Amino acid sequence: MAWRRGFGREEEDAAAAGESGLELCLGLPAYFSSSSSSKPSEGSTAAPAFALRSNGTNASKPSGAAAAAPVVGWPPVRSFRRNLASSSSSSSKQAPPPPSSSPQNGDKASKDGGAEKGMFVKINMDGVPIGRKVDLAAYGGYAQLSAAVDKLFRGLLAAQSAAADGEADAAAAGEMVGGGEYTLVYEDDEGDRMLVGDVPWQMFIATAKRLRVLKSSDLPPPSLMRAAGSRKRAAADS
């Protein structure tokens, strides 16, 4: 009987233990188990520690990489080199484009340059070793040019013929070019020798390259006649 009672208690204790395991609760299953609750707590504490260690190692690595990286802008460039580079770049950006040369402008410039060059011409006189230069644009006609030539060479002729008083007095009394003693000729752009006064004044200025004062006695008679006619036309034009 005693054995049956003991056996019956064991069955009751086992049934009570099974019923207590089947009880419902609102907590986590690990809360009711000491062994299971201790393990997750250890894992949970170990996990943050591992995370902190990993974060610490990872945080230390970028600082080392940044220290090992080369510094930008090293070696330093001197200030005057920087200023020189900046000024050259700004001047290249602000430089105006070169002017376009058109053929019409070039032809016009060449013509103007030729006209300006033709304004000053050399003039020589027979018996005078030194030449002069005259500005044809400064005179308004053939009469003014003849008077200017007389003024240029009268003193030189007087100095050369100082020994002959009669010739010097004649040269001082009369007009050399206009009086018939000397004749004014010129060389045109083709190299031909022409008498002054045969063409209009503007054409003469454009084509005359060199002037020469020749003695009328050295010229042939037809030339003298043409010279006299040209002087008359020049006097009429003036």
Swiss-Prot record:
Summary of the tissues where the protein is detected: Highly expressed in flowers.
Cellular component annotations (GO), alphabetically ordered: nucleus
PROSITE patterns, per the entry: PB1
Gene3D superfamilies the UniProt entry points to: Phosphatidylinositol 3-kinase Catalytic Subunit, Chain A, domain 1 (3.10.20.90)
Cellular compartment(s): Nucleus
Comp. bias (Low complexity): 33-44, 59-69, 85-94
One Gene Ontology term from the biological process aspect of the record: response to auxin
Swiss-Prot/TrEMBL keywords: Auxin signaling pathway, Nucleus, Repressor, Transcription, Transcription regulation
Pfam families from the UniProt entry: AUX_IAA
Extent of the signal sequence: none
Placement of sequence motif EAR-like (transcriptional repression): 24-28
Domain PB1: 118-216
Subunit-level organization: Homodimers and heterodimers.
PANTHER family linked to this entry: AUXIN-RESPONSIVE PROTEIN IAA17, AUXIN-RESPONSIVE PROTEIN IAA2
Role played: Aux/IAA proteins are short-lived transcriptional factors that function as repressors of early auxin response genes at low auxin concentrations.
Similarity remark: Belongs to the Aux/IAA family.
Protein name: Auxin-responsive protein IAA2
Species name: Oryza sativa subsp. japonica (Rice)
